[in-house]
Amino acid sequence: MSWQAYVDEHLMCEIDGHHLSAAAIIGHDGSVWAQSSTFPQFKPEEIAAIIKDFDEPGSLAPTGLHLGGIKYMVIQGESGAVIRGKKGAGGITVKKTSQALIFGIYDEPLTPGQCNMIVERLGDYLLKQGL
């Protein structure tokens, strides 16, 4: 299965008639493996800051998580595994695998829990595959 198929079929899938606003799979080096057409144009330093927070949990808390120039307030996550952010009625979930970051961005009516489930389910699957 191509990386784009993982984004299209597993991340941008429909849940209760709704889906993520945007999604992507990005390598730890910041290279895009696959992304939805709606995924924001990001800066390398934004990905570097996210990677740093996985290595040093809490480093994003004072500044927030930035992606595509949008600032998300960092909320509870799983140290070294998942970062979650909130902005207004939407937010972001980032799951780290051994080689990539899985991104899901949502807005209402999708809930934070639905976004977490979509992103973390794929991330857990990829981890089991050694990716």
Curated annotation (Swiss-Prot):
Post-translation changes: Phosphorylated by MAP kinases.
Keywords recorded for this protein, A-Z: Actin-binding, Allergen, Cytoplasm, Cytoskeleton, Disulfide bond, Phosphoprotein
Database matches in SMART domains: PROF
Cystine bridges: C13-C115
Record bears the keyword Membrane: no
Coiled-coil annotated spans: none
PROSITE patterns per record: PROFILIN
Protein family: Belongs to the profilin family.
Protein name, as recorded: Profilin-5
Taxonomic source organism: Corylus avellana
